[in-house]
Amino acid sequence: MRIFSGIQPTGSKHLGNLIGAIRGWVEGQDRGEAIYCLVDLHAITVPYDPARLRETVLDTAAILLAAGLDPERCVLFRQSDVPEHTELTWLLQAVTAYGDLQRMTQFKEKSAQQKELVSAGIFNYPVLQAADVLAYNADEVPVGDDQRQHLELARDVAQRFNARFGDTFVVPEHRIPSVGARIMDLQDPAKKMSTTAESDAGVIRVLDDPKIVEKKVKSAVTDSGSEIVRSPDKPGITNLIDILAVIRGVEPSAIESEFDGSGYGQFKTAVAEEVVAYLAPVRERYEALRPDEAHLHAILHAGAEKAHAIAHETVAVARDRMGVGPPS
Protein backbone atom coordinates (compact mmCIF):
# COMPACT_ATOMS: atom_id res chain seq x y z
CA MET A 1 0.00 0.00 0.00
CA ARG A 2 1.26 3.46 -0.89
CA ILE A 3 0.51 6.37 1.45
CA PHE A 4 0.84 10.04 0.52
CA SER A 5 0.23 13.21 2.48
CA GLY A 6 1.44 16.81 2.49
CA ILE A 7 1.86 19.61 4.99
CA GLN A 8 2.19 23.35 4.49
CA PRO A 9 5.61 24.60 5.63
CA THR A 10 4.17 27.82 7.03
CA GLY A 11 4.05 29.08 10.58
CA SER A 12 5.24 27.21 13.65
CA LYS A 13 3.61 23.80 13.98
CA HIS A 14 1.14 23.31 16.80
CA LEU A 15 -0.35 20.48 18.83
CA GLY A 16 -3.19 20.07 16.33
CA ASN A 17 -0.68 19.42 13.53
CA LEU A 18 1.18 16.93 15.68
CA ILE A 19 -1.89 15.02 16.86
CA GLY A 20 -4.08 15.38 13.80
CA ALA A 21 -1.53 14.76 11.05
CA ILE A 22 2.10 14.13 11.97
CA ARG A 23 1.32 11.34 14.43
CA GLY A 24 -0.48 9.49 11.63
CA TRP A 25 2.46 10.04 9.29
CA VAL A 26 4.81 8.39 11.76
CA GLU A 27 2.45 5.41 12.10
CA GLY A 28 2.13 5.23 8.32
CA GLN A 29 5.79 4.27 8.02
CA ASP A 30 4.84 0.89 9.50
CA ARG A 31 1.76 0.36 7.35
CA GLY A 32 3.02 0.90 3.83
CA GLU A 33 5.25 2.82 1.42
CA ALA A 34 5.02 6.31 2.92
CA ILE A 35 5.61 9.45 0.83
CA TYR A 36 5.39 12.82 2.58
CA CYS A 37 5.66 16.27 1.05
CA LEU A 38 6.34 19.82 2.24
CA VAL A 39 3.89 21.65 -0.02
CA ASP A 40 5.66 24.97 -0.53
CA LEU A 41 3.83 25.61 -3.83
CA HIS A 42 0.56 25.68 -1.93
CA ALA A 43 2.08 28.19 0.48
CA ILE A 44 2.68 30.81 -2.24
CA THR A 45 -1.03 31.15 -3.08
CA VAL A 46 -1.38 33.75 -0.30
CA PRO A 47 0.87 36.71 0.61
CA TYR A 48 4.19 35.46 2.01
CA ASP A 49 7.84 36.35 2.53
CA PRO A 50 10.19 34.36 0.23
CA ALA A 51 13.11 34.27 2.67
CA ARG A 52 10.82 33.23 5.50
CA LEU A 53 9.33 30.44 3.37
CA ARG A 54 12.76 28.89 2.85
CA GLU A 55 13.32 28.99 6.60
CA THR A 56 9.96 27.46 7.47
CA VAL A 57 10.55 24.60 5.02
CA LEU A 58 13.58 23.63 7.10
CA ASP A 59 11.70 24.30 10.35
CA THR A 60 8.94 21.95 9.26
CA ALA A 61 11.34 19.28 8.04
CA ALA A 62 13.10 19.34 11.41
CA ILE A 63 9.76 19.09 13.26
CA LEU A 64 8.71 16.08 11.18
CA LEU A 65 12.01 14.31 11.77
CA ALA A 66 11.92 15.16 15.46
CA ALA A 67 8.41 13.73 15.71
CA GLY A 68 9.54 10.39 14.32
CA LEU A 69 9.79 10.44 10.54
CA ASP A 70 12.75 8.37 9.38
CA PRO A 71 14.23 9.05 5.91
CA GLU A 72 15.14 5.35 5.75
CA ARG A 73 11.48 4.38 6.18
CA CYS A 74 9.70 7.10 4.21
CA VAL A 75 10.20 9.56 1.37
CA LEU A 76 10.29 13.16 2.61
CA PHE A 77 10.68 15.94 0.06
CA ARG A 78 9.88 19.53 -0.91
CA GLN A 79 7.05 19.82 -3.44
CA SER A 80 8.77 22.41 -5.65
CA ASP A 81 11.74 20.07 -6.16
CA VAL A 82 9.55 17.72 -8.22
CA PRO A 83 8.25 19.63 -11.29
CA GLU A 84 5.82 16.86 -12.20
CA HIS A 85 3.44 18.26 -9.58
CA THR A 86 2.88 21.44 -11.58
CA GLU A 87 2.78 19.69 -14.95
CA LEU A 88 0.18 17.22 -13.75
CA THR A 89 -1.85 20.08 -12.27
CA TRP A 90 -2.22 21.56 -15.75
CA LEU A 91 -3.15 18.21 -17.28
CA LEU A 92 -5.75 17.53 -14.59
CA GLN A 93 -7.40 20.90 -15.12
CA ALA A 94 -8.71 19.47 -18.40
CA VAL A 95 -10.95 17.13 -16.39
CA THR A 96 -11.72 19.40 -13.43
CA ALA A 97 -15.08 21.17 -13.37
CA TYR A 98 -15.05 24.93 -12.78
CA GLY A 99 -18.21 24.58 -10.70
CA ASP A 100 -16.55 22.04 -8.42
CA LEU A 101 -13.75 24.49 -7.64
CA GLN A 102 -16.26 27.26 -6.96
CA ARG A 103 -17.92 25.10 -4.33
CA MET A 104 -14.74 24.44 -2.34
CA THR A 105 -15.26 25.69 1.21
CA GLN A 106 -11.60 26.59 1.72
CA PHE A 107 -11.60 28.77 -1.39
CA LYS A 108 -14.56 30.72 -0.04
CA GLU A 109 -12.93 31.11 3.37
CA LYS A 110 -9.45 32.03 2.15
CA SER A 111 -10.67 34.44 -0.52
CA ALA A 112 -12.85 36.18 2.08
CA GLN A 113 -9.78 36.62 4.32
CA GLN A 114 -7.65 38.26 1.61
CA LYS A 115 -7.73 42.04 1.86
CA GLU A 116 -5.78 42.56 -1.37
CA LEU A 117 -5.13 40.08 -4.17
CA VAL A 118 -7.19 36.90 -4.30
CA SER A 119 -4.88 34.77 -6.44
CA ALA A 120 -5.97 32.23 -9.02
CA GLY A 121 -3.71 29.89 -7.08
CA ILE A 122 -6.23 29.83 -4.23
CA PHE A 123 -8.95 28.85 -6.69
CA ASN A 124 -6.82 26.12 -8.32
CA TYR A 125 -5.33 24.93 -5.03
CA PRO A 126 -7.44 21.72 -4.99
CA VAL A 127 -6.21 20.74 -8.47
CA LEU A 128 -2.60 21.00 -7.34
CA GLN A 129 -3.57 19.00 -4.28
CA ALA A 130 -5.11 16.34 -6.52
CA ALA A 131 -1.91 16.28 -8.59
CA ASP A 132 0.15 15.86 -5.42
CA VAL A 133 -1.75 12.69 -4.59
CA LEU A 134 -2.34 11.23 -8.05
CA ALA A 135 1.28 11.67 -9.16
CA TYR A 136 2.16 8.86 -6.76
CA ASN A 137 -0.93 6.70 -7.32
CA ALA A 138 -1.45 6.72 -3.58
CA ASP A 139 -3.87 4.19 -2.15
CA GLU A 140 -4.38 6.13 1.07
CA VAL A 141 -4.19 9.78 2.06
CA PRO A 142 -4.12 10.69 5.77
CA VAL A 143 -5.92 14.04 6.04
CA GLY A 144 -7.55 16.27 8.58
CA ASP A 145 -11.32 16.53 8.55
CA ASP A 146 -11.07 19.97 6.89
CA GLN A 147 -9.40 18.39 3.84
CA ARG A 148 -12.10 15.80 3.21
CA GLN A 149 -13.75 17.93 0.51
CA HIS A 150 -10.49 18.40 -1.38
CA LEU A 151 -9.76 14.68 -1.35
CA GLU A 152 -13.24 13.93 -2.64
CA LEU A 153 -12.45 16.26 -5.54
CA ALA A 154 -9.19 14.39 -6.16
CA ARG A 155 -11.15 11.15 -6.31
CA ASP A 156 -13.63 12.68 -8.76
CA VAL A 157 -10.80 13.99 -10.96
CA ALA A 158 -9.10 10.58 -11.00
CA GLN A 159 -12.33 8.81 -11.92
CA ARG A 160 -13.13 11.37 -14.62
CA PHE A 161 -9.64 11.07 -16.13
CA ASN A 162 -9.79 7.27 -16.08
CA ALA A 163 -13.21 7.26 -17.73
CA ARG A 164 -12.07 9.62 -20.49
CA PHE A 165 -8.52 8.46 -21.19
CA GLY A 166 -8.35 4.94 -19.76
CA ASP A 167 -7.28 3.62 -16.37
CA THR A 168 -4.32 5.73 -15.31
CA PHE A 169 -4.71 6.79 -11.69
CA VAL A 170 -5.45 4.95 -8.48
CA VAL A 171 -8.56 6.43 -6.85
CA PRO A 172 -7.31 7.21 -3.32
CA GLU A 173 -9.08 6.59 -0.03
CA HIS A 174 -8.86 9.03 2.86
CA ARG A 175 -7.76 8.15 6.37
CA ILE A 176 -9.15 10.45 9.06
CA PRO A 177 -8.47 9.65 12.74
CA SER A 178 -11.62 8.96 14.77
CA VAL A 179 -10.32 11.12 17.62
CA GLY A 180 -8.06 14.13 17.25
CA ALA A 181 -8.80 14.89 13.60
CA ARG A 182 -9.72 18.43 14.67
CA ILE A 183 -7.97 19.84 17.71
CA MET A 184 -9.69 23.07 18.60
CA ASP A 185 -8.40 26.46 19.76
CA LEU A 186 -8.16 26.50 23.55
CA GLN A 187 -9.62 30.01 23.74
CA ASP A 188 -12.27 29.51 21.07
CA PRO A 189 -13.20 25.82 20.90
CA ALA A 190 -15.59 26.51 18.03
CA LYS A 191 -12.54 27.08 15.81
CA LYS A 192 -9.80 24.70 14.78
CA MET A 193 -6.36 25.32 16.31
CA SER A 194 -4.47 27.28 13.66
CA THR A 195 -1.08 28.84 13.03
CA THR A 196 -2.89 31.97 11.84
CA ALA A 197 -5.15 32.40 14.88
CA GLU A 198 -5.74 36.01 15.95
CA SER A 199 -4.60 35.17 19.48
CA ASP A 200 -1.72 32.87 20.37
CA ALA A 201 -3.28 32.09 23.75
CA GLY A 202 -5.35 29.23 22.36
CA VAL A 203 -2.61 27.67 20.22
CA ILE A 204 -0.08 25.25 21.73
CA ARG A 205 3.07 25.45 19.62
CA VAL A 206 5.23 22.35 19.46
CA LEU A 207 8.23 24.50 20.42
CA ASP A 208 6.51 26.45 23.20
CA ASP A 209 8.32 26.58 26.55
CA PRO A 210 6.80 24.05 29.00
CA LYS A 211 5.62 26.82 31.31
CA ILE A 212 3.79 28.50 28.44
CA VAL A 213 2.16 25.19 27.47
CA GLU A 214 1.03 24.67 31.05
CA LYS A 215 -0.41 28.17 31.25
CA LYS A 216 -2.30 27.82 27.96
CA VAL A 217 -3.91 24.52 28.97
CA LYS A 218 -4.86 25.73 32.44
CA SER A 219 -6.36 28.89 30.88
CA ALA A 220 -8.41 26.92 28.33
CA VAL A 221 -11.99 28.16 27.98
CA THR A 222 -14.54 25.78 29.48
CA ASP A 223 -18.22 25.96 30.41
CA SER A 224 -19.70 26.77 33.81
CA GLY A 225 -20.46 23.13 34.63
CA SER A 226 -18.32 20.59 36.42
CA GLU A 227 -18.74 17.26 34.61
CA ILE A 228 -15.83 16.01 32.53
CA VAL A 229 -17.75 14.49 29.63
CA ARG A 230 -17.73 14.82 25.85
CA SER A 231 -20.77 16.78 24.74
CA PRO A 232 -21.65 19.23 21.94
CA ASP A 233 -22.55 21.83 24.56
CA LYS A 234 -19.14 21.39 26.26
CA PRO A 235 -16.72 22.00 23.36
CA GLY A 236 -13.85 23.18 25.56
CA ILE A 237 -13.89 20.13 27.82
CA THR A 238 -14.51 17.84 24.85
CA ASN A 239 -11.38 19.24 23.19
CA LEU A 240 -9.24 18.62 26.29
CA ILE A 241 -10.61 15.08 26.63
CA ASP A 242 -9.72 14.37 23.00
CA ILE A 243 -6.21 15.78 23.44
CA LEU A 244 -5.53 13.61 26.48
CA ALA A 245 -7.10 10.52 24.87
CA VAL A 246 -4.89 10.81 21.78
CA ILE A 247 -1.73 11.39 23.80
CA ARG A 248 -2.45 8.34 25.96
CA GLY A 249 -3.70 6.23 23.07
CA VAL A 250 -7.03 5.44 24.75
CA GLU A 251 -10.70 6.01 24.00
CA PRO A 252 -12.24 9.28 25.24
CA SER A 253 -14.59 7.24 27.43
CA ALA A 254 -11.58 6.04 29.44
CA ILE A 255 -10.68 9.66 30.20
CA GLU A 256 -14.27 10.41 31.22
CA SER A 257 -14.26 7.45 33.61
CA GLU A 258 -10.89 8.31 35.12
CA PHE A 259 -11.88 11.90 35.88
CA ASP A 260 -15.45 11.22 36.93
CA GLY A 261 -16.05 13.42 39.95
CA SER A 262 -12.90 15.49 39.43
CA GLY A 263 -13.03 19.26 39.05
CA TYR A 264 -11.99 21.21 35.98
CA GLY A 265 -8.87 22.49 37.70
CA GLN A 266 -7.61 19.01 38.51
CA PHE A 267 -8.39 17.82 34.99
CA LYS A 268 -6.63 20.75 33.32
CA THR A 269 -3.56 20.16 35.48
CA ALA A 270 -3.43 16.52 34.35
CA VAL A 271 -3.84 17.50 30.69
CA ALA A 272 -1.14 20.18 30.99
CA GLU A 273 1.34 17.74 32.52
CA GLU A 274 0.79 15.16 29.79
CA VAL A 275 0.97 17.68 26.94
CA VAL A 276 4.25 19.05 28.32
CA ALA A 277 5.66 15.51 28.58
CA TYR A 278 4.41 14.65 25.07
CA LEU A 279 6.08 17.67 23.47
CA ALA A 280 9.36 17.56 25.42
CA PRO A 281 11.21 14.88 23.37
CA VAL A 282 10.04 16.41 20.08
CA ARG A 283 11.32 19.83 21.10
CA GLU A 284 14.62 18.33 22.29
CA ARG A 285 15.21 16.45 19.03
CA TYR A 286 14.22 19.52 17.00
CA GLU A 287 16.82 21.64 18.77
CA ALA A 288 19.45 19.05 17.86
CA LEU A 289 18.35 18.75 14.22
CA ARG A 290 17.50 22.30 13.15
CA PRO A 291 21.00 23.87 13.24
CA ASP A 292 22.36 21.36 10.70
CA GLU A 293 20.78 22.84 7.58
CA ALA A 294 23.07 20.93 5.23
CA HIS A 295 21.75 17.66 6.67
CA LEU A 296 18.14 18.79 6.28
CA HIS A 297 18.73 19.87 2.68
CA ALA A 298 20.39 16.52 1.95
CA ILE A 299 17.38 14.61 3.30
CA LEU A 300 14.95 16.67 1.21
CA HIS A 301 17.12 16.34 -1.91
CA ALA A 302 17.37 12.56 -1.55
CA GLY A 303 13.62 12.37 -0.99
CA ALA A 304 12.95 14.49 -4.07
CA GLU A 305 15.01 12.15 -6.24
CA LYS A 306 12.95 9.17 -5.07
CA ALA A 307 9.69 11.08 -5.50
CA HIS A 308 10.70 12.28 -8.97
CA ALA A 309 11.33 8.73 -10.15
CA ILE A 310 7.75 7.76 -9.26
CA ALA A 311 6.01 10.95 -10.39
CA HIS A 312 7.89 11.15 -13.70
CA GLU A 313 6.62 7.72 -14.72
CA THR A 314 3.03 8.56 -13.72
CA VAL A 315 2.98 11.87 -15.59
CA ALA A 316 4.56 10.28 -18.67
CA VAL A 317 1.66 7.81 -18.82
CA ALA A 318 -0.89 10.61 -18.34
CA ARG A 319 0.71 12.70 -21.12
CA ASP A 320 0.69 9.74 -23.48
CA ARG A 321 -2.94 8.89 -22.74
CA MET A 322 -3.91 12.51 -23.37
CA GLY A 323 -1.98 12.73 -26.64
CA VAL A 324 0.35 15.41 -25.29
CA GLY A 325 3.85 15.33 -26.80
CA PRO A 326 5.29 12.62 -29.06
CA PRO A 327 3.91 9.09 -28.66
CA SER A 328 5.82 6.82 -26.33
Feature locations, PLM:
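Short catalytic-loop micro-motif centered on adjacent basic/acidic residues
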Residues: 75-78, 142, 225
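A generic secondary-structure signal for well-formed alpha-helical elements
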Residues: 61, 68, 96-99, 138, ...
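Conserved nucleotide- and phosphate/pyrophosphate-binding catalytic cores
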Residues: 15-17, 149, 155-328
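Short, histidine-centered active-site or binding-site loop motifs used for metal coordination
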Residues: 7-9, 40-42, 138-140, 197, ...
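N-terminal Rossmann-like or analogous alpha/beta NTP/dinucleotide-binding catalytic cores
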Residues: 2-131, 274, 287
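Short helix-capping/linker segments at secondary-structure and domain boundaries
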Residues: 98-102, 135-142, 245-255, 283
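Internal, conserved structured core segments that host functional sites
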Residues: 109-161, 165, 185
